[in-house]
Regions:
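Long, charge-dense
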Residues: 97-113
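DNA polymerase processivity clamps
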Residues: 1-92, 111-225
């Protein structure tokens, strides 16, 4: 069995959310951060033949990157990677050592705060936030103009530099949603985003990839209720 580049990209992204992972039998991969404020689910091309855990996912990804197109064999306590004349063995971890997502899927509450997040817009905001050393990414409405704006700032600093870009129209109620920039660990793509009390849902718009994230919002978010 080979693991595709797309699946390795998912695992690389997941290693930024949690450095350990339990992969279940089948074609669905899920992860959750140690603080349980970021959760993600992906449906991949491969059907994994058994459950197994990886404790140090960055090391596993690095080991895989040293090979060209390895073939995987999943054994009882380890996996074997064959690459030409070379062969490597990587032992599974004890699953109980890994923080794992809940088995039951998250059901998002009803919400009228929805917008499309383009990848180039998010990249632009994140670049500006990094240059200006801004820790927070927000989504705010302007009922007067009915505009919806994504912005970067430091919420705890009244004299913070900031940057904003319009991402939608039709906002009829006032709200101001706040994320920690470091929590927006998503694979570059376009997303449909839904916001509800305390949580957000990012669903990938690429029909070739089933990928979604649930990310907690900051306590100082104002939902305009």
């Amino acid at each position: 069995m080979k693991i595709s580049k797309g699946t390795m990209d998912v695992l690389k992204n997941y290693s930024e959310i949690n450095q350990s992972i339990v992969i279940k039998e089948g074609n669905e991969i899920k992860t959750i951060s140690a603080l349980k404020n970021i959760l993600s689910r992906a449906v991949v091309k491969e059907n994994f033949p058994k459950d197994f855990a990886i404790y140090d996912l960055p090391t596993f990804i690095g080991f895989h990157s040293t090979m060209s197109e390895p073939d995987f064999e999943f054994n009882d306590v380890s996996m074997t990677m064959k690459d030409g004349d070379g062969k490597g063995k990587y032992f599974y971890a004890e699953p109980s050592l890994v923080v794992t997502p809940p088995e039951k899927p998250i059901e998002m509450p009803e919400s009228d705060i929805k917008f499309e997040l383009k990848n180039d817009v998010l990249e632009d905001i994140m670049k500006k936030a990094n240059v200006l050393k801004l820790a927070d990414i927000g989504l705010k409405s302007c009922p007067k103009s009915q505009g919806l704006y994504l912005y970067a700032t430091n919420k705890n600093n009244d004299t913070s530099n900031d940057y904003s870009v319009k991402v939608g129209d039709g906002a009829t109620k006032k709200f101001n949603i706040v994320f920690k920039k470091d929590n927006l660990k998503i694979i570059p793509s376009d997303y449909d985003v839904t916001i509800a009390n305390g949580i957000s849902h990012f669903k990938n718009k690429d029909t070739n990839v089933e990928l979604e994230y649930w990310i907690s919002l900051e306590a100082n978010s104002d939902y305009g209720e």
